[in-house]
Every structure is written in structure tokens, then in C-alpha cells.
């Protein structure tokens, strides 16, 4: 406390001196002249006044001298003060200059240190990147080693590790640069997946047991038999090794693409699997693809699993061949999904799928059952010339955009119960070989069944048609049910106004199998008439006609 008091006192006491020195320095000449003149005046006038007052002698002389002494003393003190102030100022300037030079030196040293640090960091970055690229080159060489599967697998994991390193390098690279470096490696892995493997063509044979017979195939030549069996065993092992390597690549990709709700660390990469021959199962379930995905002309020899996958970028499966089952349950396509001219040899499951910009299934071949139940098509969707060899199920499917099924072929049952067609639904010249079920469906836009062929039964029970509905030129070969159907526009069974392209109803169906009793609340009814064939009376739509389905040239009304 005492020291603090002393410090405070010192600071306080120095302030007046500093102010006094500044004052003296500022007005030094004036003070000097003023004091000299004043002192001289006093030395002259005071003795003179004393003389007038009658005080004379040595007193006035002594007084004059004392005044001059005091004046000289004051002038001397002022000179000392000025000298001290000048010295202090010069010293302060010198210290300020020293401080300035010191700060400049420090700043230059700091800049030098920062520059050296930046240079070292750049060198470090270059070294790190050079080391990674060196490891990349080594890994590619390992991946190219056809003699040793273990070496190839090591190359795979080295590349995978490098991708993660690049992506984690936030301190050295921008996000765009990290993605660019990772994409290079992804391209290499995809290229490896796409590369042909000759033994894959014999996968079906090599996956089984050795079946050749010594006597029948080699005429008892034991040496040839043993050599062929050894070659089979060697090829079988090589195929399995390569299968494991490629499956591991897909497995690692999937683990970095999880999950479907949020993008994974590898989701932003483009994946090119075009023309790939997958001789092993593919599992991309729950994967999230944010960028483009290309499976054009790819062949899936075993199950392809895309369960609950999300495709935020372009997804192209055009001309892909799925030999076994393909599971797209719950998938989400943010952009238009392209399956044009693809083929599905097993079951194709798109149950609960979401197609936010529609889909193209033109000329697709579904050999197994195709399930699109509860699927949601937000934009226009095409099944033009699609072939359904198995059942085609669209239970509660939602087509919010235009839907095109023209010239499609359903070889087995076609089920559209409770489906919703938000805009135009076009089934022009579609062929339904077995049952066609539209019961409970709702057509909010125009519905065209122009020249459709219903070879078996067709069910429109409780179906709602909000706009124009055309059945002109359609063929009904089996039971036809329009019971409790609602039409908000008059249904057309022939072209107007000339009544050409009449709908045709087979005379081989039982009359009771034809039901045109629409709902009581339907604004429009199906106007009917009675027509007789060989003594059998049929009730058919007014503008329709009976025909013989066994006579392809029987276009005229019977």
C-alpha cells in the first residue's frame, strides 16, 4: 500500500513539473524578455521612487542590486528549466526513435518468421500431398497385380484409406479440392469394378463342382483328367478371390454412403458403373447418392439390393440387365429415374418408391413380378412398350403427373386397385392378357384406353373418372365390370361424331359377365343397348358392338 501511495504521489507530483516545463518552453523567449525588462524596470524605478520618497543613500543602491540579482536568478532558473526540458525532449525523441527502430525490427523479424512458417507449411503440404500421390501410385500398382489377390486387396484398402485422408484434410484443402482428390480415387475403384474378368463368364460352371468324367471326357487319360481338374480348382479359387475383392470395394463404398436419411462421407462423389458385369451380389441398401450414378448397360447376375436407397443426383439404369431379383423397396429418386430398356429377370420390387421427377421405364422387360405398390410418381412417367411377363402390381400407386402405358404388354395380371392418376393416363394399344384390375382407382385427368385389348377380365368396380374417358376401339374379351363406377364426363365407346373405332365385346363371354351399372350418383351413365348373337342377348354400351375374338378379320359388327 505504501509503495502504491508513493507511486501515485510520484505520478501526481510529476504532472505540474511537466506542465511548468512545457509552459516555460512554449513561452521561453517572452518570459525571458519580460522578466529582463521587468527586472530592469524595477531596478530603475524602485530606487527612483525611494529617492522621491526621500530615502537615499546606500539602500537604494543595494535594492537595485538585489533586484538585478533576483532578475538574473530567475532568468538563470528559466534557462535551466528550458535546458532540462530540451534535454528531456531530446531524450524522449531518442527513445521514441529507438522504440520505432525496435518495432520495425520486430515487425520485419515477425514477417520473416511468418513467411518462413508459411513456406514451411507449404513445403509440408507439398510433402504430404506428394507422399499421398506416391502411395496412390503404389496402390494402383498393387491393384494391377493379377498374380496375387492379397496384393490387390491391399491396394484396395490403401486407396480407401487415401480417400478418407483427403476428405479429412480440412486444414490444407478446400472442400472442392478434397472432393476432387477423392474423386480421382473413386474413379480408379469404379474402373476396377468395370474391368472385365474373363473367368466371370464361367461363373455358373465354376461355382459348381467338377463334373467331368475320366472315361467319358478323357477316354481314361488320367494325366489329362488330373490336369483339367487342377485347372478347374485353380480357376474356381481365382474367381472366388476376385469376387471377394470386388465385393469388398462395394462394401466399403456402401459403408461410406450410409445412411439414406443423411449423406455419407462419400455421397458427393460420382459413381460410374456403366457396362459393368457384376458376377456377385450387389448391396447398396440404405445408401445415399448425392451426385450422379451410372449403371447404364450394367449386368447384375445375382441379387441387386437398393433397399431404401436415396438418389439425389442423376440415376441412370438404362439398358441395365437384372438377371436375379432387384430390390428398390422404399427408394427415393430426387431427379428423374432412367430405366429405359432395362430388363428384370427376377422380381422387381419398387414398393413404396418415390420418384420426385418421374421415371422412364420405356421398353423395360419385367420377366418376374413387378411390384410398384404405393409408389409415388410426382412428375410424368413412361412405361411405353414395357413388357410385364409376370404380374404387374400398382396397388395404391400415385401418378401425380402424366402416365404413359401406351403399347405396354401385360402377360399376366395387371393390378391397379386404388391407384390414383392425377393427370392424363394413356393406355393406348396396351394389351392385358390376363386380369386387369382398376377397382377403386381414381382418374383425375383424361383417361385413354383407346384400342386397348383386354384378353381376360377387366374390373372398374368403384372406379372414378373425373374427365373424358375413351374406350374407343378397345377389345373386351372376358368379364367386364363397370359396377358402381362414377363418370363426370360421358364415357366414349366410339369416336365421335362418326362412331368409328367402336369398342368390341366378345360374344363368347357370358352375358351376365358384362356389368355396366354405374353408381347411382354418377353424373353420367353408360348408355347401353341390347344386341343378340345366335339367340343369346347381350347388353353392351350403345356405341359398342359384339365381335368374334377368334376371327382377327371380324371388324364388322355381328
Regions found by a protein language model. Give the residues of each.
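Extended hydrophobic/Leu-rich segments
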Residues: 20-24, 72, 531
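Juxtamembrane interface helix immediately N-terminal to a transmembrane segment
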Residues: 5-38
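N-terminal leader/targeting and pre-domain segments
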Residues: 125, 137-141, 147-153, 157-160, ...
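Short helix-capping and inter-helix turn/linker motifs at the boundaries of alpha-helical repeat units
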Residues: 129-134
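Helix-centric, low-specificity signal for extended rod-like, repetitive segments
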Residues: 23, 57, 77-79, 103, ...
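Membrane-embedded hydrophobic alpha-helical segments
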Residues: 26-127
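Eukaryotic N-terminal accessory cofactor-binding modules
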Residues: 3-5, 13-15, 21-22, 54-57, ...
Amino acid at each position: 500500500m505504501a509503495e502504491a501511495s508513493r507511486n501515485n504521489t510520484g505520478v501526481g507530483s510529476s504532472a505540474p513539473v511537466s506542465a511548468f516545463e512545457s509552459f516555460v518552453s512554449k513561452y521561453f523567449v517572452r518570459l525571458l524578455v519580460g522578466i529582463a525588462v521587468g527586472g530592469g524596470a524595477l531596478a530603475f524605478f524602485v530606487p527612483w521612487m525611494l529617492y522621491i520618497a526621500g530615502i537615499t543613500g546606500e539602500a537604494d543602491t543595494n535594492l537595485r542590486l538585489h533586484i538585478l540579482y533576483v532578475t538574473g536568478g530567475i532568468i538563470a532558473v528559466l534557462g535551466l528549466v528550458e535546458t532540462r526540458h530540451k534535454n528531456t525532449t531530446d531524450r524522449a525523441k531518442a527513445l521514441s526513435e529507438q522504440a520505432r527502430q525496435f518495432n520495425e525490427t520486430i515487425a520485419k523479424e515477425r514477417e520473416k518468421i511468418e513467411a518462413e512458417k508459411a513456406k514451411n507449411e507449404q513445403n509440408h503440404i507439398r510433402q504430404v500431398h506428394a507422399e499421398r500421390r506416391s502411395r496412390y501410385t503404389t496402390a494402383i500398382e498393387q491393384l494391377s497385380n493379377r498374380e496375387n489377390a492379397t496384393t490387390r486387396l491391399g491396394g484396395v484398402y490403401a486407396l480407401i484409406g487415401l480417400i478418407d485422408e483427403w476428405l479429412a484434410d480440412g486444414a490444407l484443402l478446400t472442400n472442392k479440392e478434397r472432393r476432387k482428390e477423392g474423386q480421382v480415387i473413386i474413379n480408379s475403384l469404379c474402373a476396377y469394378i468395370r474391368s472385365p474378368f474373363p473367368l466371370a463368364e464361367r461363373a455358373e460352371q465354376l461355382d459348381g463342382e467338377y463334373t467331368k468324367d475320366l472315361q467319358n471326357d478323357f477316354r481314361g487319360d488320367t494325366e489329362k483328367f488330373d490336369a483339367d481338374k487342377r485347372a478347374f480348382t485353380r480357376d474356381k479359387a481365382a474367381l472366388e478371390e476376385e469376387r471377394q475383392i470386388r465385393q469388398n470395394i462395394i462394401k466399403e463404398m456402401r459403408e461410406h454412403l450410409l445412411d439414406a436419411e443423411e449423406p455419407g462421407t462419400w455421397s458427393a462423389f460420382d459413381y460410374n458403373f456403366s457396362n459393368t458385369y457384376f458376377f456377385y451380389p450387389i448391396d447398396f441398401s440404405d445408401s445415399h447418392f448425392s451426385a450422379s450414378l451410372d449403371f447404364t448397360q450394367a449386368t447384375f447376375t445375382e441379387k441387386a439390393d437398393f433397399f431404401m436407397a436415396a438418389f439425389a443426383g442423376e440415376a441412370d439404369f438404362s439398358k441395365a440387365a437384372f438377371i436375379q431379383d432387384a430390390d428398390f423397396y422404399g427408394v427415393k429418386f430426387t431427379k428423374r429415374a432412367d430405366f429405359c430398356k432395362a430388363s428384370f429377370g427376377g422380381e422387381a420390387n419398387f414398393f413404396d418408391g418415390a420418384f420426385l421427377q418421374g421415371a422412364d421405364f420405356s421398353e423395360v422387360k419385367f420377366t418376374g413380378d413387378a411390384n410398384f405398390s404405393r409408389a409415388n410418381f410426382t412428375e410424368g412417367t413412361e412405361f411405353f412398350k414395357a413388357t410385364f411377363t409376370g404380374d404387374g402390381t400398382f396397388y395404391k400407386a400415385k401418378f401425380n403427373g402424366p402416365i404413359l402405358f401406351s403399347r405396354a404388354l401385360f402377360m399376366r395380371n395387371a393390378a391397379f386397385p386404388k391407384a390414383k392418376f392425377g393427370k392424363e393416363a394413356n393406355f393406348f394399344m396396351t394389351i392385358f392378357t390376363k386380369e386387369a384390375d382398376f377397382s377403386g382407382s381414381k382418374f383425375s385427368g383424361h383417361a385413354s384406353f383407346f384400342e386397348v385389348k383386354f384378353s381376360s377380365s377387366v374390373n372398374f368396380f368403384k372406379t372414378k373418372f373425373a374427365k373424358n374417358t375413351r374406350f374407343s376401339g378397345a377389345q373386351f374379351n372376358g368379364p367386364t365390370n363397370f359396377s358402381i363406377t362414377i363418370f363426370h364426363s360421358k364415357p366414349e365407346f366410339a369416336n365421335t361424331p362418326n362412331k368409328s373405332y367402336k369398342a368390341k365385346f366378345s360374344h363368347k363371354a357370358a352375358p351376365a359377365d358384362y356389368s355396366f351399372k354405374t353408381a347411382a350418383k354418377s353424373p353420367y351413365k353408360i348408355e347401353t343397348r341390347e344386341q343378340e348373337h345366335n339367340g343369346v342377348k347381350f347388353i353392351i354400351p350403345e356405341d359398342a358392338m359384339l365381335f368374334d375374338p377368334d376371327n382377327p378379320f371380324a371388324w364388322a359388327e355381328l
